[in-house]
Amino acid sequence: MKEYKTIDLFAGIGGIRLGFEAFGCKNVFSSEWDKYAQSMYEVNFGEKPFGDINDISPSDIPDHDILLAGFPCQPFSIAGKGLGFADTRGTLFFNIEAILKAKKPKAFLLENVKRLTTHDNGNTFKVINDKLNKLGYTVYHKVLNTLDFGLPQKRERIYIVGFLDKLHFEFPKPIGKYEELSNILESDDVVPNNYFLSDELKRKRLSSITKDVPYPSIWHENISGNVSALPYSCALSVGGSYNYLVVNGVRRLTGPEMLRLQGFPDTFEINIPYSQVRKVAGNSVSVPVIRAIAGSMINSLNMATRKIYQAIQLSLLD
C-alpha cells in the first residue's frame, strides 16, 4: 500500500491524524495554537505542533498528499457577496485555501460543525465550495453522525472531501450500531469524589426527569433546563457547563471517558488539567468516523494509481 503524506492543520490533540495513521499515512507537518492541545499532542505523537497558522507561510509547509483540517467555523461576514478572493480573507479558511493553492495536494479532508451548510443562508458554504472548485478540486460533502459509527455519542459534523483529480468517492456507510456506555464509563467507586454532584444538584436533576431512565445513561441538560437521560451521550461541547453531561445523574464525565466517547484509545495520554481536557475533547473529532472516511479516501486514491499504472502498462504493449 502506498504511503501517503499528510499535514494536520488546526490539529487539536490529533484525532484526524490518528484516523489516517490507521492506513499507514505519515504526517509531515502539524499546526495548533492552543498550548494545552499542543502539550497533549506532543506527549502522544512525539512532536510539538507549530503554532498559529497565520504565522506560517505556505511555502514553508512540506509537500504532502493529503491536507487534513478540522478548521474553526468563523463568521463569513461578507461571504457570497461577489467580492472575489477577499470574501474569505480574515477567516481561517483563507489559510487552507492558500496552502491548497500553493502545494496542490492530491486530496483533502475538512471537518466542521453541521450548521456550516446553513450559516448566512448557505452563503458561507457556497463560498467555500466555490473556492475549492476554482482550485481544481472535485468536492464531496456529507453530514455524518458519530452515533452511526460505533460510538455512543450523538455528534453530527459535516465532512468535506476533495480530490485534485476527478476521482470517484463514496462516504462510508453507517455501521448501524454503537458501543454500550458500560464499555466507556468507569465504575463509580474508582472515580474521585470531586466529580460527584452535590445532593442538591442531584435532586434537582432527578426532579426534571419525566421518562424512564435507562442504566447506564448520560443525562443531558439543554439550554432550556430540560433534562433527558439517554443510553448515549449528546455531543461533547466546549461551551457546556461542568454539569452539561452527567453520568447516571450523579457525576461528571472523567477525562478518559470523554476521550473514549471520541474514540481515542486508552493508551492516549492525558497530561493537562481537567478543565482543559473538557475543552480539547469537545473540540476534537470522533476518530472512528475519521478512520472510516480515511479508508474510503485511500481506496479512491489507490484505485486512481492502479488505473494510471495499468494505462502505462498497456501503452508499453502497443
Curated annotation (Swiss-Prot):
A methylase, recognizes the double-stranded sequence 5'-RGCGCY-3', methylates C-? on both strands, and protects the DNA from cleavage by the HaeII endonuclease. Belongs to the class I-like SAM-binding methyltransferase superfamily. C5-methyltransferase family. It catalyses: a 2'-deoxycytidine in DNA + S-adenosyl-L-methionine = a 5-methyl-2'-deoxycytidine in DNA + S-adenosyl-L-homocysteine + H(+). Its EC number is 2.1.1.37. It is an enzyme of class 2 (transferase). GO terms for molecular function: DNA (cytosine-5-)-methyltransferase activity; DNA binding. Keywords: DNA-binding, Methyltransferase, Restriction system, S-adenosyl-L-methionine, Transferase. The active site is at C73. One of its GO terms (biological process) is methylation. Residues 4-304 form the SAM-dependent MTase C5-type domain. This is Type II methyltransferase M.HaeII. The keyword Ubl conjugation does not apply. It comes from the Bacteria. Gene3D superfamilies: DNA Methylase, subunit A, domain 2 (3.90.120.10), Vaccinia Virus protein VP39 (3.40.50.150). The keyword Disulfide bond does not apply. InterPro entries: C5-MTase, C5_DNA_meth_AS, C5_MeTfrase, C5_meth_CS, SAM-dependent_MTases_sf.
